Regions:
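Long extracytoplasmic/lumenal interhelical loops at the membrane interface
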Residues: 262-277, 285, 289-328
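Hydrophobic transmembrane alpha-helices and their immediate junctions
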Residues: 217, 327-362
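Membrane-interface catalytic loops of GT-C/OST-like multi-pass glycosylation enzymes that act
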Residues: 82-87, 149-152, 199-204, 314-319, ...
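A membrane-periplasm/extracellular boundary helix in multi-pass inner-membrane enzymes
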Residues: 198-199, 219-263, 275-285, 293
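Transmembrane signal-anchor hairpin modules in multi-pass inner-membrane enzymes, especially those
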Residues: 1-86, 96, 103-116, 169-183, ...
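Alpha-helical transmembrane segments of multi-pass inner-membrane proteins
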Residues: 72, 100, 110-141, 149-220, ...
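Hydrophobic core segments of transmembrane alpha-helices in multi-pass, intramembrane catalytic enzymes
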Residues: 32-43, 87-99, 153-169, 203-215, ...
Length: 406
């Protein structure tokens, strides 16, 4: 009897800790790390072997585990020290959490805690960001204007995901609760405006275009996608005309592309091109199984000459696909792409939760063309918790509907 009483309580504690992780994610790496450990300690006793096995045997839960396993085996043929191999595997570890989250939120009725906690935390971050931008002399510990914590890359990613999640919710509520829908649209516009006027990553600008087309396609079909492109073009033109910050961000990137190969490559865009070029050469050396886990720093050191600038010796090729391909070859790349496809397939229905999951996966897939976001701390955990949470909610809904059928 005592065990039966403790189990639901422990389950609620695990749900609460998952919500706490979501709240902390936009703000603090240290707090997020501590809360993730506490969440794992709380959630593991609430899961039975059968439920975890069910998720591991499914594509959505099993392919992340497979990718981690390939990373672990990849240490065996890596020609670097064991400390470098272990460091290389560290980015893969978070993938093991996805089956646990799927199992937890397939069963838990408290997934809304996590979503609302993350949204509330992001709204507070949005308010602080705008306050820093609009109030000269107001100080914060952030190093960049309008970016109170962490960095503009993660902040703009969070704001983009929140904005399109709110767009989806507003579209769903438009007929039944129009006032609430308008409020959600205003909040979404505030997130988008922050990206355009305050702080953004150039990758986020690319992802916004993809998400706009996806939103139009999902809500209104191919005509909606065309409409989204037209509306997006008009809004982009308006923001471009009124935002010196956005013009400067894009103009600098365009100038760096033009100057690449004819002048100094030591620019963010130039370095990316060099990382990609060298990474493709490394992949060609070991195309099937790669050079092994943790070998990226050693490969860039090996390729360096006396004239090589220090910034060209990196641990991160700034492409998720190339990061995996260099270490695990075609085999690892196939597992990565299969995982993304499985997660996209998980969110193929028309519910609002599925839309939110689709937004999370789309952001990670598109941004990973330009960054190794799955292995980064903030973006990686955002993906893992987002997919695990929304995937569990989709599976729970499907289970209930199946159970209710005569």
């Amino acid at each position: 009897m005592a065990a039966a009483i403790r189990a639901p309580r422990l389950g609620q504690i695990a749900d609460g800790l998952a919500a706490a992780v979501a709240v902390s994610l936009p703000w603090s790496t240290s707090a997020t790390s501590i809360l993730i450990v506490l969440w794992i300690i709380a959630v593991v006793p609430t899961l039975d072997v059968a439920s975890v096995r069910r998720e591991v045997m499914s594509p959505a839960g099993g392919l992340p585990v497979l990718l981690w396993a390939l990373g672990a085996f990849g240490m065996l043929w890596a020609d670097v020290s064991w400390s470098e191999r272990i460091a290389g595997l560290s980015g893969f570890h978070k993938l093991l959490v996805i089956p646990l989250l799927l199992a937890q939120f397939r069963r838990s009725p408290h997934a809304d805690w996590v979503i609302l906690g993350f949204l509330a935390s992001s709204v507070v971050l949005l308010v602080v960001s705008w306050a820093l931008m609009l109030t000269p002399g107001l100080s914060w510990r952030g190093r960049e204007l309008g970016v109170p914590v962490k960095n503009y890359i993660l902040q703009s990613a969070i704001f983009a995901i929140c904005a399109f999640g709110l767009f989806g919710q507003a579209a769903e509520l438009w007929r039944t609760r129009p006032r609430l829908a308008v409020m959600l649209l205003v909040l979404a516009a505030a997130f988008i405006a922050n990206i355009g006027y305050v702080a953004t990553a150039r990758t986020t600008l690319v992802v916004l275009g993809v998400m706009a087309v996806l939103f139009g396609l999902r809500q209104f079909g191919w005509k909606g996608a065309v409409g989204a492109c037209l509306v997006g073009a008009v809004l982009t033109g308006a923001v471009w005309a009124s935002s010196p910050y956005l013009r400067a961000r894009v103009s600098v990137a365009v100038e760096q592309v033009r100057n690449y190969g004819t002048s100094d490559v030591d620019t963010p865009v130039g370095l990316r091109f060099e990382y990609w070029k060298k990474s493709l050469a490394f992949v060609a050396e070991a195309p099937v199984i790669g050079h092994g886990t943790g070998t990226i720093p050693a490969l860039f050191r090996r390729d360096a000459t006396a004239e090589t600038i220090p910034s060209l010796i990196t641990t991160n090729p700034h492409s998720q696909i190339l990061t995996v391909a260099v270490q695990l070859g075609i085999l690892g790349t196939a597992a990565l792409i299969a995982m993304w496809i499985a997660h996209l397939a998980l969110f193929r229905d028309g519910t609002q939760v599925a839309w939110l999951g689709l937004v999370l996966v789309t952001y990670n897939v598109v941004s990973s063309l330009f960054n190794s976001h799955l292995f980064d701390f903030g973006q990686g955990w955002l993906y893992v918790f987002g997919v695990g949470l929304t995937g569990g909610m989709v599976l729970r809904r499907a289970s209930i509907e199946t159970w209710d059928k005569p």
